[in-house]
């Protein structure tokens, strides 16, 4: 009876003890992050670094509308294909949009020489001035400028020709040698385009130009070329057996371009004074134009995001996140989210930072939970929480700032004869893309690992801070909790939290209670030893009596014979 009483008193003493625990915040977040060592770690707070959504629209870029070429491509627009007349007034744009199946390019069959290079040059142009470089009425008085039309470039059912070129033919039965020049006084680069006609037979050559041995010479400071017509039979394209090759050059400010020919020249009529602008570009897209504004445009749609990475499209125009192949880039800012199991009781797993966090502590990341005669409650440690928030916020901002180099990324241009170069370029681009993706993912993994370790360290430091104050005035009971050997009211609890706990004040009371508890433990241990001995002896006696009874019964019925020899 005495032993039972002592054990009961011991249990009551443990139940009534004042307790303080160190723990961390938990919530109902389902955010998961990856670290170097773990995948899908549930955390209380995190930030997404990867943009994966767009609006599916073509938008104005910083308030400036794009130039939609519609059914025309770059060649048709610049040469002046009659079907592209609606594009003639275009003067400025934020970016240029081609459709994948644009059908109106060069209308008279032939080849546009160095077309891909021209597209590359144009991708950095944001506006131009279209002007008459060689006025039609005065530049070629000895040549016909009116009959050079073709059904291949028909418009409204009638034969026509490019709006920016003049097809010069003989006049009055002759094609005298022509010489004409232009001096660039625009103060900017001027794009000049011209063509060379290659008839299919000598009859057409004589009909159009009279001279059989014709030539065309085009010369500037940076360009010097002499062309000879190639007269040969060819299969018809767009009902034309002849061909026309198209050429271009950029004329620097102050430079002069000179044309000399005695036949087959498709002369410049209009030229373009170019104004380059950073952030322009050419994209190929089927998306439609809408009344919207953006800072970043992709062929799939506009991106309005300040995140450093995106996985939508590698081609971008404007201030855009860096394209990576990652499916997820999430950086942790909070803690591991392991809400404690409520049914285990307040000071079981719920109390500690080992088995779980506290959903009840909402005003900080780290803090305390106490229980005494005045009640119980949570209190966040504001100083350590604020220091952690500041540190992590600065780190996240630094990562975003370093990686958030927003820029335009347009595709490179290659013609059909440069497939090996194009394939090599794709491999190089893929290599750089893999490196960028790897660097981005590794950066996030490392920073997530460091952040979670940082939180663990902060909780441990808070625990050690309390432990160093309480010393032997309390005992560690696991899960981040301490059980006081003395009464600790709310004022006492607050002193532990703010680091002003008066150890000497409670030392004597703690010493007495500690000795009482130790005494109960010793006496309880003696009682248990006596009970153990008694239990052993009693069990042995019961066993002997049972064996004797069984032996007597077996002897009496003859099952067992007993002989005693003297």
Curated annotation (Swiss-Prot):
Assigned protein family: Belongs to the influenza viruses hemagglutinin family.
Organism of this sequence: Influenza A virus (strain A/Henry/1936 H1N1)
Top-level taxonomic group: Viruses
Biological function: Binds to sialic acid-containing receptors on the cell surface, bringing about the attachment of the virus particle to the cell. This attachment induces virion internalization either through clathrin-dependent endocytosis or through clathrin- and caveolin-independent pathway. Plays a major role in the determination of host range restriction and virulence. Class I viral fusion protein. Responsible for penetration of the virus into the cell cytoplasm by mediating the fusion of the membrane of the endocytosed virus particle with the endosomal membrane.
A Gene Ontology BP annotation from the UniProt entry: viral budding from plasma membrane
Record field: transmembrane: 530-550
GO cellular component: host cell plasma membrane; membrane; viral envelope; virion membrane
Residues exposed to the Extracellular side: 18-529
Entry-listed glycosylation sites: 27-28, 40, 286, 304, 498
Parts forming coiled coils: none
SS bond list: 21-481, 59-292, 72-84, 107-153, 296-320, 488-492
Spans within the Cytoplasmic topological domain: 551-566
Name of the protein this chain belongs to: Hemagglutinin
Intracellular or extracellular location(s): Virion membrane; Host apical cell membrane
Cleavable signal peptide: 1-17
Lipid-modified residues, S-palmitoyl cysteine kind: 555, 562, 565
Gene: HA
InterPro entries according to UniProt: Capsid_hemagglutn, Hemagglutn_HA1_a/b_dom_sf, Hemagglutn_influenz_A, Hemagglutn_influenz_A/B
Post-translational modification: Palmitoylated. In natural infection, inactive HA is matured into HA1 and HA2 outside the cell by one or more trypsin-like, arginine-specific endoprotease secreted by the bronchial epithelial cells. One identified protease that may be involved in this process is secreted in lungs by club cells.
